[in-house]
Amino acid sequence: MSVMFDPDTAIYPFPPKPTPLSIDEKAYYREKIKRLLKERNAVMVAHYYTDPEIQQLAEETGGCISDSLEMARFGAKHPASTLLVAGVRFMGETAKILSPEKTILMPTLQAECSLDLGCPVEEFNAFCDAHPDRTVVVYANTSAAVKARADWVVTSSIAVELIDHLDSLGEKIIWAPDKHLGRYVQKQTGGDILCWQGACIVHDEFKTQALTRLQEEYPDAAILVHPESPQAIVDMADAVGSTSQLIAAAKTLPHQRLIVATDRGIFYKMQQAVPDKELLEAPTAGEGATCRSCAHCPWMAMNGLQAIAKALEQEGSNHEVHVEERLRERALVPLNRMLDFAATLRG
């Protein structure tokens, strides 16, 4: 069945690339951020897809570098009164939903996500209304308003387990917004899943022909793939998983060379995990084609040192995340279900 909104035809204006900083400027902003974090009783929570220098700063200041599920856990449990979320807007909203008593700052509130943009709440509500017999499961990469409509929120790290659980209960599913991840989960579980047709602009660009050529060039390499990638790319993988699961796979696979099909921001932590292995970027452009994202989310790239310093220094409407209380309470229900379910998996 077609949906009311077609993300494939939507045009997402990319933000301008941040102005490069000199070595001296980087050193200046790094020290300024460290000082401001202490003064504000703040901690950094950074996603794997942010730039390496941002992840390094989060490490050095006692913050967190992780996938969206662990970011949510860390921020809710940390005693800091202020969370600086280096990521995209839905991550800041999720932090505010889980920690309403804390000040949530972002380097920019214009850091979007194509999956979030590709699932407008009005169209999604109409889609759900047309299928009232289905349990609504939405990916973490959605707005607070879409989460508020859901029965469950899920991340890629526990998606298969959750849908397998719901399928065992005989529940039919609406899955949104990522069509590739939805199809992967459906294939793994056999569940009755009706997918919204969104896609990540980064993972959607991986090309099978170019990947095949790279594989022929490096026949001893293992291929690691995020399930937001097209099915044909997933079918070529030696390991499929979330960001944290791909890092774990890099450690356990015997191969000394790894081709990685996800945002290249992950290379910072993956290379730390396997310093003796060679990491190669999976190609994003096919024969005669060009890439838009080129394996790095343009909105993640907005989380620069200068923007982080400005967020900590200025606060205010340009940097602080707010979620209306009634909306927050509704979105909290499926988020807590996710966290509780994830806790049962961890034992």
From Swiss-Prot:
What pathway is this protein said to act in by its record?
Cofactor biosynthesis; NAD(+) biosynthesis; quinolinate from iminoaspartate: step 1/1
Note accompanying the cofactor annotation: Binds 1 [4Fe-4S] cluster per subunit.
Q: What is this protein called?
A: Quinolinate synthase
The record's GO CC annotations read:
cytosol
NCBIfam families linked:
nadA, PRK09375.1-1, PRK09375.1-2
Q: Which UniProt keywords apply?
A: 4Fe-4S, Cytoplasm, Iron, Iron-sulfur, Metal-binding, Pyridine nucleotide biosynthesis, Transferase
This protein's cofactor list reads: [4Fe-4S] cluster
Q: Give the UniProt subcellular location, in the record's own words.
A: Cytoplasm
Q: Which residues form a coiled coil?
A: none
Q: A single GO BP annotation from the record? A: 'de novo' NAD biosynthetic process from L-aspartate
- What is the role of the protein in this entry? Catalyzes the condensation of iminoaspartate with dihydroxyacetone phosphate to form quinolinate.
Q: Which residues bind iminosuccinate per the record?
A: H47, S68, Y139, A140, N141, S156, H226, P227, E228, T243
User: Origin organism of this chain?
Assistant: Escherichia coli O9:H4 (strain HS)
| Keyword S-adenosyl-L-methionine tagged | no
What is the E.C. number? 2.5.1.72
The record's listing under PANTHER family reads: QUINOLINATE SYNTHASE, CHLOROPLASTIC, QUINOLINATE SYNTHETASE A
SUPFAM superfamilies to which the protein is assigned, alphabetical: NadA-like
What's one GO MF term for it?
quinolinate synthetase A activity
